[in-house]
Amino acid sequence: MSPWARRKMAMQFLYAMNFLHRRGVCHRDLSYRNVLVHTYRGSDAFMVKVSDFGLAKERGSDLTSTGSSMKGSIIDPALKSFRDFKPVNDIYSIGFILNYILTGKENLVTDGSRLGSIIQKCSATNSADRYRTVWDIIEDMRKAECPVG
C-alpha cells in the first residue's frame, strides 16, 4: 500500500475516534483487531471502521465493566483503574494503531520525523505529555507533509 493510502487510512481512523470522543464515548478496548478496513473490489477505495464497542463507556455513565478481559488491547500503563478511563487513555492506544497503519509495524517510530513525533506524543508513557484530544492529532497530521513508510 502506498504511503499516501496509509495516510488516508490513518486519517479515517482518527476521524472515527474524534467522532466518538466528541460525543463523550471512550472506546476503552482499542486494538489492532478492532480497526477494520473494507476494500472495494476493482478500485483503490477503502473504508476504515472501528469495531467492538463492548467496553465503550459514555461520559457521565456510572455503568462500567471493570472485570472484562481485554485480549489484544493496547492498555495505557498510566491507567490506574479501568473505572477512571478518559479520552487520554484511548489516545495512548491510538498512537500504536496510528503507527501500525502508517508503517505496517508494531514497533513505534522513533526517527524524529514529524509523523514519528505525533506517534510518540500519542503514546507517551506520562499521560500529561500526550495530546488532549483526537482533534489535536488530526490538526498535526494535516501539517505533516509526507507519511512515513
Residue spans for each PLM region:
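Activation segment signature within eukaryotic-like protein kinase domains
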Residues: 9-10
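Catalytic-loop of the protein kinase fold
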Residues: 20-40
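A conserved short helix/loop substructure at the end of the activation segment
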Residues: 124-136
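Conserved C-lobe helical segment of Hanks-type protein kinase catalytic domains
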Residues: 117-124, 140
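C-lobe/activation-segment region of protein kinase-like
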Residues: 49, 53-119
